[in-house]
């Protein structure tokens, strides 16, 4: 089963690496300030994201309409 095909799962997409500096500038943040997403997350595995990638997550909200947020993929520490 593809997790992304479930109606409750928001859209996840990898931001191209060359666009990350623009995103950091837009929000006046550093890479380490993004919320984290583990590289073992089932959706991360499904879209092929690797540590260092930034994932754009777009979901629909009944109050805000479309809501977009970003997460940094990090390696799982063992």
Curated annotation (Swiss-Prot):
What keywords are assigned to this protein?
A: Cytoplasm, DNA-directed RNA polymerase, Nucleotidyltransferase, Transcription, Transferase
InterPro entries this protein is in? Answer: Arch_Rpo5/euc_Rpb5 (IPR014381), RNA_pol_subH/Rpb5_C (IPR000783), RNA_pol_subH/Rpb5_CS (IPR020608), RPB5-like_sf (IPR035913)
Q: What is its main location?
A: cytoplasm
**GO MF annotations in UniProt:** DNA binding; DNA-directed RNA polymerase activity
- One GO term of the biological process aspect: transcription by RNA polymerase II
State which Enzyme Commission number(s) the record gives: 2.7.7.6
- GO CC annotation, single: DNA-directed RNA polymerase complex
Give the matching Pfam families: RNA_pol_Rpb5_C (PF01191)
Catalysed reaction per UniProt?
Answer: RNA(n) + a ribonucleoside 5'-triphosphate = RNA(n+1) + diphosphate
Subcellular location(s): the record lists: Cytoplasm
Origin superkingdom:
Archaea
Outline what the protein does.
DNA-dependent RNA polymerase (RNAP) catalyzes the transcription of DNA into RNA using the four ribonucleoside triphosphates as substrates.
Q: How does it assemble?
A: Part of the RNA polymerase complex.
What's the family? Belongs to the archaeal Rpo5/eukaryotic RPB5 RNA polymerase subunit family.
PANTHER family reported for this sequence? DNA-DIRECTED RNA POLYMERASES I, II, AND III SUBUNIT RPABC1 (PTHR10535:SF0)
Name it.
DNA-directed RNA polymerase subunit Rpo5
């Amino acid at each position: 089963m593809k997790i992304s095909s479930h109606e409750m799962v928001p859209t996840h997409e990898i931001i191209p690496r060359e666009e990350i500096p623009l995103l950091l500038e837009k929000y006046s943040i550093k890479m380490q300030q993004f919320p984290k997403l583990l590289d073992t997350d089932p959706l991360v595995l499904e879209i092929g994201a690797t540590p260092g990638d930034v994932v754009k997550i777009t979901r629909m909200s009944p109050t805000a309409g479309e809501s977009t947020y970003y997460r940094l993929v990090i390696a799982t520490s063992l």
